[in-house]
Amino acid sequence: MKRIGVLTSGGDSPGMNAAIRAVVRKAIFHGLEVYGISYGYQGLINGDIKKMELGSVGDIIHRGGTMLYTARCEEFKTLEGQQKGIEQLKKFGIEGLVVIGGDGSYRGAQQLTKHGFPTIGVPGTIDNDIPGTDFTIGFDTALNTVIDAIDKIRDTATSHDRTYVIEVMGRHAGDLALWAGLADGAETIVIPEAEHNMEQILATIKRGQERGKKHSIIVVAEGVGSGIEFGDRISKEMNMETRVTVLGHIQRGGSPTGADRVLASRLGAKAVDLLLEGKAGMTVGIQKNELVYHPIDEILDRPHTIDQEMYKLSQELSI
């Protein structure tokens, strides 16, 4: 293998630039040429591909977002779109591809592998919802962003004796809500992986009031439902002032934490190693601080699960 490509796809996450940097530098270290594909699979179809040098990835390790840009591409879900992408890869002489993104990005990588093109997936998503790895690139940064926001909201909640509902990202996974809620001592954490009982939530708030508690913090993953609806119901049922904050896309931005920079560097470099070893259709990850890899097919067939021990702890501490 003499020439590889790298792209980012789907939602951006802090640390993607560090992963791109690692792929480019590791490949050049081993004498390979590297081509960056802009705007994900859409850019691949369109031939938006340029050669990258060491200087191409200078001064990016600390930057959020992705220097290669990203996009969602419905066309690549079709056989025709996939064939167009493969034609572009062949046109540029690219023999292997590193795809950085979430499960949708992995599905594109899976199709390329089925067509006989060596592809390695690197988990980049703030949702932390990719099986086969303890952490995904961007999760730690997003977690710290959410914690910082809740810390500030708690100050004003206490000052005004209010209950706050904070909606965080996580359409199908509650990791961000669970970890942030536990770190911030939320009274209630509502996630897609666990059933929630509104009566129990109201009872928890009421017990706090009876103890003289000046505020309540409720963290809701967006996949469960609207934070605004939660807030409205609490206001009506408890006859109390409730405020709702939807954190939104602020969770995706910002300079990546040290943990995300190191994780991204390790995973990006490992992806290049796997291509050099002749592996294809694999995803890289980290488990118990050890780098691992798994078949993409296996990862996509495996459901995301929450850390039950952490969820149990959050329930025990929010009495």
From Swiss-Prot:
Compartments (UniProt record): Cytoplasm
EC number: 2.7.1.11
Domain of life of the organism encoding this protein: Bacteria
PROSITE patterns reported for this sequence: PHOSPHOFRUCTOKINASE
InterPro entries found in the cross-reference section: ATP_PFK (IPR022953), ATP_PFK_prok-type (IPR012003), PFKA_ATP_prok (IPR012828), Phosphofructokinase_CS (IPR015912), Phosphofructokinase_dom (IPR000023), PKF_sf (IPR035966)
Keyword set, alphabetical order: Allosteric enzyme, ATP-binding, Cytoplasm, Glycolysis, Kinase, Magnesium, Metal-binding, Nucleotide-binding, Transferase
Binding site for ADP: 21-25, 154, 185-187, 211, 213-215
GO molecular function: 6-phosphofructokinase activity; AMP binding; ATP binding; fructose-6-phosphate binding; identical protein binding; metal ion binding; monosaccharide binding
Cofactor: Mg(2+)
Reported regulation of activity: Allosterically activated by ADP and other diphosphonucleosides, and allosterically inhibited by phosphoenolpyruvate.
Pfam family, one: PFK
Sites where the protein binds substrate: 125-127, 162, 169-171, 222, 243, 249-252
HAMAP family for this protein: Phosphofructokinase_I_B1
Stated name of the protein: ATP-dependent 6-phosphofructokinase
Organism of derivation: Shouchella clausii (strain KSM-K16)
Organismal lineage: Bacteria, Bacillati, Bacillota, Bacilli, Bacillales
Gene that this sequence comes from: pfkA
